[in-house]
A protein has these predicted regions:
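A short glycine-rich, Lys/Arg-flanked "PGG" loop and its adjoining helix->strand segment in the class I
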Residues: 189-201
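Conserved beta-strand signature within the Rossmann-like core of class I S-adenosyl-L-methionine
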Residues: 202-209
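Conserved SAM-binding strand-loop segment of SAM-dependent methyltransferases
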Residues: 148-160
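Conserved class I S-adenosyl-L-methionine
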Residues: 96-106, 124
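Conserved SAM-binding loop of SAM-dependent methyltransferases across substrates and taxa
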Residues: 107-119
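A short acidic, Gly/Pro-enriched loop at the edge of an enzyme's catalytic core
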Residues: 161-173
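Class I SAM-dependent methyltransferase Rossmann-like catalytic core
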Residues: 16-26, 63-87
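Core SAM-dependent methyltransferase catalytic element
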Residues: 244-266
Length: 266
C-alpha cells in the first residue's frame, strides 16, 4: 500500500482577518435582534427604529464587503495581497550581498520572498506580534522552514520605534504596511527616520504604507524634502493605489486606496 506524502504549505494569512469578519458579523446579529425587538414590542419611537434598521443594513453590507475583500486579497481570488508585496519587492535595488531588515514582518511573507530572491543574503524580520493579526514568531520560523530559507532568516520581537540594532547595520531595509500600525509612535515620520538609522550609507530602502492617508502622514511631500536635505537625495514616491491589479472595490481609503511606496538609496 502506497503512502502519501503530505506537502506542508506556508500560512501567510490574509490582511482581512477572519476575526474582523466575525466581529462585524456579530455586531450585525446584535443589531438585528435589537431591531426585531424594537419593531415587535415598542410602539412609536420611529426615529430610533429607523436608526437601528439602518445599522443592521450597514453592518450587513460591511460583513459582505469584508468577505469579498478577503477573497480579492487571497490567492484563490485576485491575489492582490501578493501582488502588492511583489510591487515592493520589485523596487529593491540591491545586489543581494549582505544583510536586509524587514520591519513588521508579520507572518514572514516579505522576509521569505527577499530570502528566496537573493540567495546570498541574510534577512532579519522584526515584529511586535501583539496578537491582533494572529501572526507570531513561531509562524514566521515555520513558514521559513517550509520555504527552505530558514538558514538565512531570523526573526526577532522588536518595536519599530526602537529597533535593537546599531546605526548602519543593514544593506537593505524594507517595511510593508507596518508604520501606520505602530502604537508606540504617534509621529509616523519618526519610524521612517528610525528605519533609515540602521541602514548603511549607500544601502537601499523600500517602505510601503498608507502614505496617502493624511491622518497618518499629513505632510508627506515636506518630509520627503527634509530627507533630501538630510543627504538622502535618491528618493522616489510611487502611488501603489493606482496599480491596475488592484480592483476598484479595494481602492477605498481604509483598504488599498491610500497605499504608496517610498524607496531609494541612503
Amino acid at each position: 500500500m502506497e503512502s502519501k506524502t503530505i506537502t506542508q504549505k506556508p500560512e501567510y494569512g490574509n490582511w482581512v482577518s477572519l476575526e474582523l469578519i466575525r466581529k462585524v458579523f456579530f455586531i450585525f446579529l446584535l443589531f438585528t435582534v435589537v431591531d426585531a425587538a424594537l419593531w415587535a414590542w415598542l410602539p412609536g419611537w420611529l426615529p430610533l427604529k429607523i436608526t437601528v434598521t439602518l445599522l443592521v443594513l450597514f453592518t450587513l453590507t460591511a460583513t459582505i464587503y469584508f468577505c469579498f475583500a478577503r477573497y480579492l486579497f487571497s490567492p484563490e481570488g485576485k491575489d492582490v495581497q501578493n501582488q502588492i508585496t511583489d510591487l515592493l519587492l520589485s523596487r529593491i535595488s540591491w545586489n543581494g550581498d549582505g544583510k536586509a531588515l524587514d520591519i513588521g514582518c508579520g507572518s514572514g511573507a516579505l522576509t521569505i520572498k527577499i530570502a528566496k530572491k537573493y540567495g546570498n543574503a541574510h534577512i532579519t524580520g522584526v515584529d511586535y506580534w501583539d496578537g491582533s493579526w494572529g501572526y507570531s514568531k513561531k509562524r514566521c520560523e515555520e513558514n521559513s522552514r517550509i520555504e527552505g530559507v530558514s538558514s538565512r532568516t531570523d526573526f526577532i520581537k522588536a518595536d519599530a520605534s526602537k529597533l535593537p540594532f546599531a546605526d548602519h547595520s543593514f544593506d537593505a531595509v524594507v517595511s510593508n504596511l507596518t508604520f501606520h500600525e505602530v502604537k508606540s509612535s504617534r509621529d509616523k515620520y519618526d519610524l521612517i527616520d528610525e528605519a533609515l538609522r540602521v541602514l548603511k550609507n549607500g544601502g537601499c530602502f523600500v517602505f510601503q504604507d498608507l502614505f496617502l492617508f493624511r491622518a497618518c502622514y499629513p505632510h508627506l511631500n515636506e518630509h520627503i524634502e527634509l530627507l533630501r536635505k538630510s543627504g538622502i537625495g535618491n528618493i522616489t514616491f510611487l502611488d501603489t493605489s493606482k496599480s491596475s491589479f488592484i480592483p476598484r472595490a479595494l481602492k477605498l481609503p481604509f483598504m488599498a486606496g491610500t497605499i504608496g511606496i517610498l524607496y531609494g538609496t541612503k
